[in-house]
Amino acid sequence: MAHRFPALTQEQKKELSEIAQSIVANGKGILAADESVGTMGNRLQRIKVENTEENRRQFREILFSVDSSINQSIGGVILFHETLYQKDSQGKLFRNILKEKGIVVGIKLDQGGAPLAGTNKETTIQGLDGLSERCAQYKKDGVDFGKWRAVLRIADQCPSSLAIQENANALARYASICQQNGLVPIVEPEVIPDGDHDLEHCQYVTEKVLAAAYKALNDHHVYLEGTLLKPNMVTAGHACTKKYTPEQVAMATVTALHRTVPAAVPGICFLSGGMSEEDATLNLNAINLCPLPKPWKLSFSYGRALQASALAAWGGKAANKEATQEAFMKRAVANHQAAKGQYVHTGSSGAASTQSLFTACYTY
């Protein structure tokens, strides 16, 4: 016989629900600016810019100081610990700049992968130790949501039942701890696109992973109305020779979600998974036009697919600030339109927006 002990007060539930809904309201999505120092270094290296704290700060200042109308397209920004405490050139905290624009501030909470012994190089995610204390401090510092990324891959004997269950339980425990501290948890069980599997195989695995995640969330008494999901779109592996249309990706993706994600979840914000900027937008638009029931807001939580053109336009030069902001705003508006099924591809995208952003075994 199951016994129920209240996990959250009505006031806590109300706050969490309102935060989650505000992030995805009216076609808004999320900018994932939570790249680690090492990952940001890889991005800067491609444009021949040194990976220093000042260069990282300068690029993010350009993004965050964009015109306030960005709040019509971006509802939340995920920050890395370093960025949460950085300031602009006038001494103003980035988090306060975002809040003044009406954008909700989030934080990356997982601490990377650890090997699962007895599996084919599978991992579970670290970061549960001390998580409650970190969440409490971040809440005091103005953070209202968190993000935790679990990584699963399709390969020989992968993902194993052990990896699926272990990562689902870690996600659920993280989500529960977040909510206890007033943070909306973004649940990110990512089936990465490495491999040569086809669309149907990815759909099958994605359904198994999401079903396990929501079983675990239920077991851990997580309040679904105060959460957001950040899944992969259902796509073929990067090395698959068969190509699929955005409409085929959309049908497989929405079918998988319809079978596994409760309607209580207010929003699903897709990761871009190394797609080009333009492909990520076209697929999101097709998903919102898919003729299947869609009880959730279907939006975006993009990092590379919102920043690639902006980074290329910047090139490490302060004189390129306006061009950088224009490139960022263009992608943000395009994805805002796609989140409402209203994006029209004009064919005038720059080279950076059509270049694949895939990185094998990608880590933040």
Swiss-Prot record:
Major localisation: cytoplasm
Keywords associated with the record: Acetylation, Cytoplasm, Cytoskeleton, Glycolysis, Lyase, Phosphoprotein, Schiff base
GO biological process, one term: fructose metabolic process
Family, as annotated: Belongs to the class I fructose-bisphosphate aldolase family.
Enzyme class: lyase
PANTHER family hit by this protein: FRUCTOSE-BISPHOSPHATE ALDOLASE
One function term, GO molecular function aspect: fructose-bisphosphate aldolase activity
Subunit structure of this chain's protein: Homotetramer. Interacts with BBS1, BBS2, BBS4 and BBS7. Forms a ternary complex with G6PD and TP53; this interaction is direct.
Site positions per UniProt: Necessary for preference for fructose 1,6-bisphosphate over fructose 1-phosphate: 364
Residues annotated to bind beta-D-fructose 1,6-bisphosphate: 43, 272-274, 304
The EC number(s) this enzyme carries: 4.1.2.13
Catalytic machinery residues: 188, 230
Protein name, entry field: Fructose-bisphosphate aldolase B
Alphabetized Pfam families for the sequence: Glycolytic
Lineage: Eukaryota, Metazoa, Chordata, Craniata, Vertebrata
One Gene Ontology term, aspect cellular component: centriolar satellite
Role summary: Catalyzes the aldol cleavage of fructose 1,6-biphosphate to form two triosephosphates dihydroxyacetone phosphate and D-glyceraldehyde 3-phosphate in glycolysis as well as the reverse stereospecific aldol addition reaction in gluconeogenesis. In fructolysis, metabolizes fructose 1-phosphate derived from the phosphorylation of dietary fructose by fructokinase into dihydroxyacetone phosphate and D-glyceraldehyde.
Catalytic activity: beta-D-fructose 1,6-bisphosphate = D-glyceraldehyde 3-phosphate + dihydroxyacetone phosphate; beta-D-fructose 1-phosphate = D-glyceraldehyde + dihydroxyacetone phosphate
Modification N-acetylalanine occurs at: 2
Gene (name only): ALDOB
Keyword Cytoplasm included in the entry's annotation: yes
Subcellular localization(s) per the UniProt record: Cytoplasm, Cytosol; Cytoplasm, Cytoskeleton, Microtubule organizing center, Centrosome, Centriolar satellite
Pathway: Carbohydrate degradation; glycolysis; D-glyceraldehyde 3-phosphate and glycerone phosphate from D-glucose: step 4/4; Carbohydrate biosynthesis; gluconeogenesis; Carbohydrate metabolism; fructose metabolism
Misc. remarks from the entry: In vertebrates, 3 forms of this ubiquitous glycolytic enzyme are found, aldolase A in muscle, aldolase B in liver and aldolase C in brain.
Modified residues (Phosphoserine): 36, 89, 132, 272, 276, 299, 301, 309
